């Protein structure tokens, strides 16, 4: 009814899966479904697993409960360490995912991670077509690590932070260059960024967080986690919000312990250019070319730029 057509189903909760399946009856083709491999429901609780028997059973369950014969994105769940990635990439989980893709039951293979170094390895392997990654202006400042809880730990923001972490910047640029789409999780930092107790020390709005994520290279969609209809409405308000409400640059400039000086955030806040140049897009393409050392495949996008 509101135009939402992309949905992430990380949870293996059988009741939720069945409810979604009933809601999609007669209109499955109108939706892009991202469902996770390696999650199971045991004793009324979610559990991550790499046991191939459990992975197979859970995937069959999600197809049955969603009343469909395919998933658009089969997302390999929660790969935050290099050891886990190596196990997945060279083991039964990836073989199963590839098998399901060949059978047409998975259209694209994805991987979810909070660690930019692991995510980059997955993207560069050529095995992954979609990356689910945590993207927001606070997490983007943090270095790569295998403990995702450090991303929201208070001590991680105790000192002065300057500009985006290079590993994260490289990840986004590589995804753009290789054509790997990013679906965003944690755009609001689990809600932490929307309050005055935010790690940044300043509350951001839903519109600002969504716009920040959507202006990163390669980002295709933001998966807004919602608990209520009101929270869903708040995210949907982004679609009709004016540019002034989406603008996050002024808010980022007020962060007491964070500096973005000398780093383009692709926010467009410097507009209008007296020469009519789309500075944000041109700078993004420049950074992509610098990262690759040559004019990248994304040069085709240059044709969409408006000439002054």
Predicted regions and their residues:
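Conserved small/polar residues in nucleotide/adenosyl-binding loops
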Residues: 303-308
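Acidic (Asp/Glu)-rich catalytic clusters
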Residues: 21-29, 64-67, 123-126, 177
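N-terminal binding-site loop/beta-alpha segment at the start of enzyme catalytic domains
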Residues: 1-37, 102
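An active-site-proximal structural segment forming one wall of the substrate-binding cleft
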Residues: 52-66
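Beta/alpha (TIM)-barrel catalytic core signal, keyed to glycine-rich beta->alpha loops juxtaposed to Asp/Glu
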Residues: 1, 79-284, 291-298
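Glycine-centered flexible beta-alpha turn that most often forms the glycine-rich phosphate-binding loop
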Residues: 7, 71, 109
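Active-site groove signature of glycoside hydrolases
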Residues: 66-84
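Structural motif corresponding to the early beta-alpha repeats
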Residues: 26-53, 76-80
